[in-house]
Amino acid sequence: GLRKNPDGKRLQEILPPELYARWVPLKERYVGKDDDINGWRPIFAAAVLYEVALRKRGFETTGVIWPTVEKLARKSKLEVTEPTVSVKVEKPRDAIKEFKNAPLDDLDCFAKTIERLESDLDLMRVRANAWAVGDVAQLRQLAPVDNASACIAVVMNAQVMQDRGYTDWPARRAEAWLAAVEQALARNV
């Protein structure tokens, strides 16, 4: 399917040797013996590795912070404003077919995800505790490797997206966020 490398190559064949050497112990530790993942595109292999590693280390990726934020907002009679950017893809089947067969520049996403897992899993707990008590200085000091932006960029910079006119996603995301901030301030201050 969509996750497999279009040319049938395996991660060992497409990753630089030093990056592949870093992947192997993380894959064995968190994903286990499942060898199918080695035939996936780096972006998809990285995403699964990251999700499984977080889960196995006791981190929840959904439903932890947001319910508390919503509860506090309701208690304070504040309306939550969520910035969103919608991307409508014309002829989605054609786009998926193109994406499936197109090369992706996803090594940076993969490398940053590996780096984050190697250096940041233990710090995530420290950062979560700092966030919980509002220790902004410690949060700034413990800024994580930003693998998410690199991985989002892979998809948004893919030729299939560029051909469909989605070239301005960072600006659209920033505009949506600023508009949501302005709406929230106007409504809640």
Predicted regions and their residues:
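Structured, acidic catalytic/metal-binding patches in enzyme active sites
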Residues: 1-165
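A cross-kingdom marker for long, charged
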Residues: 155-156, 160-189
